[in-house]
Amino acid sequence: MSKKLKAAIIGPGNIGTDLVMKMLRSEWIEPVWMVGIDPESDGLKRAREFGLKTTAEGVDGLLPHVLEDDIRIAFDATSAYVHAENSRKLNELGVLMVDLTPAAIGPYCVPPVNLKQHVGTLEMNVNMVTCGGQATIPMVAAVSRVQPVAYGEIVATVSSRSIGPGTRKNIDEFTRTTAGAIEQVGGAKEGKAIIVVNPAEPPLMMRDTIHCLTETEPDQDAITASVHAMIAEVQKYVPGYRLKNGPVFDGNRVSIFMEVEGLGDYLPKYAGNLDIMTAAALRTGEMFAEEIASGTIQLPRREAALA
């Protein structure tokens, strides 16, 4: 029996296509289905070229095939507005859901900070926050594990060309979801998130600024060491995650300046915001697959599959 979990990707846009390209190299996840709503979409055509089965009838077009193709995990890269219904339909069939939209109906997952907690409990839906969240929350957590953080603020700057229509429709959800995760995962008592979409040509690489206000005077050596250790953890799945400057200390304010370069799988390397999202989502799926293969956690039983 293959150790790979068979996967469906919902949403054939920038994120979904990049995810497929990464999955094709994965030892733990096998992409089988790509789900879209437009029969003419480039993303569905590309998925077929990669050898995936496709449907243009949304998740409803996938449901009849879930059991026969043994789909065990789905990655939703559509929109916050449709995710809840997609997740409900697939969870009912025993499919784990990794949510790459800002819907956040499941618990937030930022792999280097809290992935292990989720895997131990087999959450049926985990939310990958946002690209800005994946890039910045590890840094907030790096500070808050040293000493309490009263306030965390992040500014994610991404190139206009790297974000598709789904992300543009979800800007408000992006800021709310990221701010919530700065608090719940990052450990700040209060969080704020800002996204800047830069139309400059040639496109600029993703840049992220993280400001933390500590409750007491910052322990500069301990925070600096913690930040560097956390960067090394993120680089295990996003090699282009780099410290540009910092940590810079000004009174109780700690400022960290990051740059994220992508692998250039689907979009060029400037779209590090895509890469950090898809790489984190795949890392999450792979961790579930590893734990299932080792017998640490059990997949839900499927009555129909046993009949």
Swiss-Prot record:
It is an enzyme of class 1 (oxidoreductase). InterPro entries: Acetaldehyde_dehydrogenase, Acetylaldehyde_DH_C, NAD(P)-bd_dom_sf, Semialdehyde_DH_NAD-bd. The keyword Oxidoreductase applies. GO terms for molecular function: acetaldehyde dehydrogenase (acetylating) activity; NAD binding. Its EC number is 1.2.1.10. Disulfide bonds: none annotated. The keyword Electron transport does not apply. Pfam families: AcetDehyd-dimer (PF09290). Keywords: Aromatic hydrocarbons catabolism, NAD, Oxidoreductase. The active site is at C131 (acyl-thioester intermediate). GO terms for biological process: catabolic process. This is Acetaldehyde dehydrogenase. It comes from Stutzerimonas stutzeri (Pseudomonas stutzeri).
